[in-house]
């Protein structure tokens, strides 16, 4: 496996103004991308740039633009748009690459850079390696007659709305359904309410007033308590929450109970199996609840686990010929409808199943019985990867695994996007699960 100097599991991410997430580095990053794309061609490459609603996005947009133009690449500025919208637009506008400035579900003082290929897919390892090598080379400014040009794309919202609506049948409607939509003050704030209203839903929209600083703050897919309370207070049929860049979706049922990515995978897999839409293997991750695997097995649906990260789920789907996969966090991949995880498109697929079958969300989940599972994040001041190598942590992990042997699973892993260690314990008994989790988390905290 290639060891990356700059790229993490989902692009480059960190605290604004520190390390790689600085204007000068992003300037060099844009220049490196432009040089890689220009290799072996006579015409200027074209790159789309989108962003979420963080205030630092303006700074990094300008830096990327300058670096690309200096390398001789044309740029189209999309503005605030969901990450999957940039993937779609990169493909449909025939761009050579797409770039998204976002830190997804992280707070406003983080930011990051994600890349898409010309086909709207995550970059492969070889392209990432070429960009990293170009970053280390001297900055290139081409002669003035070869500098890139910049323009702003005006019809991006309409294009993406039509793409999203095309992911469900022509006669699909949300009339008679009351929804609460939480857009996390993020990239879906102006698109998702418009789209769901066009489809006929009665809508209560929250998290739709971004100010550059409030993205993911107490709202969105990482703070479902806000959505749940609004669903109960408004008497809605269900709630839908996106994260800051719109590539994740979670839901709540009419009682405000959380419906996570494992739940949504079950709803889709069961219905698609019955309709003949399901192809190949359903792909989850090492963190997917064992109850999901059991429920799919009962239905005769093959299920495999990939490493944590939507790029690994995507890779496993391609290798197995599957079309459906995802993570409990809400990254869902419906590869017969979109090239990457798309919160809006995934939500529409779930709603289409519910409308077609005449079921509520809670009714659609009656065949799924999940094993008690809980995850805690322990802050780690240094490189989080070092935590799993510490002798006392490794010993505590062995003891935790022994405690649940035959009754559950234990996972300890460094986050690929945040300075935390994630600890997950799954067991058939909730008391055993909590005790095992507490003991292991205490050891990790003491070692931090």
Curated annotation (Swiss-Prot):
PROSITE patterns: PGM_PMM. One of its GO terms (biological process) is peptidoglycan biosynthetic process. One of its GO terms (cellular component) is cytosol. Its cofactor is Mg(2+). The keyword 4Fe-4S does not apply. The active site is at 104 (phosphoserine intermediate). It catalyses: alpha-D-glucosamine 1-phosphate = D-glucosamine 6-phosphate. The keyword Magnesium applies. Its EC number is 5.4.2.10. This is Phosphoglucosamine mutase. It comes from Xylella fastidiosa (strain 9a5c).
């Amino acid at each position: 496996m290639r060891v990356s100097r700059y790229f993490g599991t989902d692009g480059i991410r960190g605290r604004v103004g520190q390390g790689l997430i600085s204007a000068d580095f992003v300037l060099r990053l844009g220049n490196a991308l432009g040089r890689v794309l220009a290799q072996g061609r006579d015409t200027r490459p074209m790159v789309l740039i989108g962003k979420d609603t963080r205030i630092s996005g303006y700074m990094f947009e300008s830096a990327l633009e300058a670096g690309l133009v200096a390398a001789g690449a044309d740029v189209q500025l999309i503005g605030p748009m969901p990450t999957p919208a940039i993937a779609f637009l990169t493909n449909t506008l025939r761009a050579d690459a797409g770039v998204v400035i976002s830190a997804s579900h992280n707070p406003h003082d983080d930011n990051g850079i994600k890349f898409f290929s010309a086909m709207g897919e995550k970059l492969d390892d070889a392209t990432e390696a070429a960009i990293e090598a170009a970053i280390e080379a001297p900055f290139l400014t081409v002669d003035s007659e070869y500098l890139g040009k910049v323009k702003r794309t005006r019809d991006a919202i309409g294009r993406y709305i039509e793409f999203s609506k095309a992911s469900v049948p022509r006669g699909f409607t949300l009339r008679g359904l009351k929804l609460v939509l939480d857009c996390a003050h993020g990239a879906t704030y102006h698109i998702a309410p418009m789209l769901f209203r066009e489809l006929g839903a009665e809508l209560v929209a929250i998290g739709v007033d971004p100010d550059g600083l409030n993205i993911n703050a107490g709202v969105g897919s990482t703070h479902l308590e806000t959505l749940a309370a609004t669903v109960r207070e408004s008497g809605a049929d269900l709630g839908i929450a996106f994260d800051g860049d719109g590539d994740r979706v979670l839901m709540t049922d009419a009682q405000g109970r959380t419906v996570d990515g494992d739940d949504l995978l079950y709803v889709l897999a069961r219905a698609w199996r019955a309709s003949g839409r399901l192809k190949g293997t359903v792909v989850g991750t090492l963190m997917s609840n064992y109850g999901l695997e059991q429920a799919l097995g009962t239905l005769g649906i093959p299920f495999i686990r990939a490493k944590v990260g939507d790029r690994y789920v995507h890779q496993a789907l391609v290798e197995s010929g599957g079309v459906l996969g995802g993570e409990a966090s809400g990254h869902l991949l419906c590869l017969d409808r979109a090239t990457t995880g798309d919160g809006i498109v995934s939500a529409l697929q779930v709603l289409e199943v519910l409308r077609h079958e005449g079921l509520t969300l809670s009714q659609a989940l009656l065949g799924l019985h999940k094993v008690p599972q809980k995850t805690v994040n322990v802050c780690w001041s240094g490189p989080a990867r070092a935590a799993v190598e510490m002798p006392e942590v490794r010993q505590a992990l062995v003891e935790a695994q022994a405690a649940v042997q035959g009754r559950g699973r234990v996972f300890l892993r460094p986050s690929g996007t945040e300075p935390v260690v994630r600890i997950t314990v799954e067991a058939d008994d909730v008391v055993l699960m909590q005790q095992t989790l507490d003991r292991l988390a205490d050891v990790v905290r003491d070692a931090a």
